[in-house]
């Protein structure tokens, strides 16, 4: 399927005014959840990535439907001890400027808890929401506070306020960006 044949509204501002930028052929249909013992040949099919830009808000985005596992996106971003120290040094001025010590922070899509650990080390009361049970278990083994949820579901059930909201390596996978940000 090529861009020209697909009706599409911007994922951020919902404008129908989008410009086709480029179609990129030959990309894998999926990038995770492969079972090498029982290969699913449908996952190995290539697709065309249809890149467009919104004429109203400027967002560059894919017109393709989101992958079925967008709530359970696996990140390869691990943090070495040196990376954690560097991140702590980067975040410390923010924590101090906005008086976040002992204040509540939530990380959306907290993965294995790498960023939660850094927040905790800065004396921020960090809490994560994550959809992957495997990641939740790993985070809880580190004594981190993580619940199973996706942001749009979480806000409907909980009326909590946070002084800081963190979203690393996750926002770009959301199909309804505007709804997600408003949550």
Residue ranges and their predicted role:
Residues 91-183:
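Conserved SAM-binding loop
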Residues 2-82:
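N-terminal juxtadomain amphipathic helix
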Residues 38-39, 47-50, 79-83, 90, ...:
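Short, surface-exposed, polar/charged, turn-prone segments marking secondary-structure boundaries
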Residues 42-44, 86, 130:
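Short, intrinsically disordered/low-complexity patches at protein termini
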Residues 20, 26-27, 63, 84, ...:
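Short linear sequence motifs
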Residues 49-110, 115-122, 127:
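Fe-S ferredoxin-like electron-transfer domains
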Residues 33-36, 75-77, 85, 132, ...:
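Surface-exposed beta-strand edges and their flanking turn/coil or helix-capping segments
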């Amino acid at each position: 399927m090529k861009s020209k044949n697909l009706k599409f509204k911007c994922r951020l501002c919902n404008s129908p005014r989008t410009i086709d930028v480029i179609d990129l052929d030959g990309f894998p249909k999926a990038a995770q959840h492969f079972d090498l013992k029982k290969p699913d040949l449908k996952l190995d099919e290539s697709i065309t990535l249809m890149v467009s830009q919104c004429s109203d808000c400027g967002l560059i985005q894919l017109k393709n439907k989101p992958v079925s596992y967008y709530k359970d996106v696996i990140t390869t971003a691990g943090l070495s001890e040196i990376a954690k120290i560097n991140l702590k040094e980067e975040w410390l001025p923010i924590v101090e400027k906005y008086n976040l010590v002992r204040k509540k922070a939530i990380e959306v899509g907290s993965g294995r808890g790498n960023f939660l650990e850094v927040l905790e080390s800065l004396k921020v009361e960090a809490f994560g929401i994550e959809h992957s049970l495997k990641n939740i278990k790993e985070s809880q083994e580190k004594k981190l506070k993580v619940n199973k949820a996706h942001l749009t579901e979480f806000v409907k059930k909980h009326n909590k306020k946070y002084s800081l909201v963190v979203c690393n390596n996750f926002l770009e996978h959301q199909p309804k960006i505007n709804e997600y940000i408003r949550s």
